[in-house]
Amino acid sequence: MAGGRPAGSAIEMEGAMRTLPSSGRPSGTGWQSRGPLFGRNYGLSPGSRLLPPRCQENADPQKMAFLLRKQWTLYSVSPLYKFSSADLKDYARMLGVFIAAEKQKGLAVDVDGELGIKVAMSGLPELRGSEQDPAAVLVQLSLRSSVSPKNSEEKLIWSGWFCCVAGDDLLENLPENFTCLPLFLVNGAESYTAIVGSWFQKTFDCCFRRLAISPLNLTWMAAMWTGCKVDKNTAATELLFSVPHLPQPLDISYAIHPEDAKALWDTVQKTPGEITQEEVDVFMECLYSHFHRHFKIHLSATKLVKVSTGIASAHCDGIIKFLQSQYLIGVLMLLTELAISQIQ
């Protein structure tokens, strides 16, 4: 199947061909929802989840726009000890001193000697699923001139933000003096991420881990995001598969027209607003069968590595891109769940 293609090549196929695959839903009662709404049994595959369209009516448009259409690398973070959102300015100053000290030791990123790094921390109270969730925290690093810092332009070079959206179960059992912000998203150089993470670990006795996304959770994302209402001009739903056991890497890109994907989902979904494991499985099986019918390739023998929709895109390596602000809370709910399952 590689056909002599160079390493890292990809086969792009328009899977839907404007022909809607049938749902093929199994009859009987063998398929049941196995868990509470939105999978509160952390660490287990939930029976059902919910992706609510949550418009950010009171959100700062500039801050929301800043989060969109960027590649964010995902981390899970254990609870922070004696962290206070009231002290963000002090934390920013302390982190700035720490970065300067690391730079003097040769551990920080090597930058122009005429430049210094400015640290800013601010709250993002809009990014909460409930009043019980702590406000998200945004950390930004900017370069500024040390010759005339007052008049110089600052260049944003790194951003990271901590959040907890609908982390009710963990919050209920959280010990005193701990703050739960289990999801950390980063855009910028890994060297800055390492330094910022080191300071947080030393200051708040927490632990960071890269957060990967399993193929199973990618199928959930494909189904959940397909079920959301978006503009007609949205991009195609695209699934990227990696073919294993080949001498050279090979990816298969499966693109489905968004209207066809939504129409298929509507034939699969039983309860509006709620998505079950059964429905995810049936949805993916329909897509796989349709693809095999046209291209004679069994996608079930490959590995799903990336999902792209009009709502967001996600890669198995733990890379996410948000595309719709009105669904940002819903996407963060799922990512928070995955982060909590990793730290428990």
Curated annotation (Swiss-Prot):
Belongs to the CENP-L/IML3 family. It comes from Gallus gallus. It holds the Pfam family CENP-L. InterPro entries: CENP-L. The keyword Nucleus applies. Keywords: Centromere, Chromosome, Nucleus. Residues 1-32 are annotated as: Disordered. Component of the CENPA-HI complex, at least composed of CENPH, CENPI, CENPK, CENPL, CENPM, CENPO and CENPP. Component of the CENPA-HI complex, a centromeric complex involved in assembly of kinetochore proteins, mitotic progression and chromosome segregation. This is Centromere protein L.
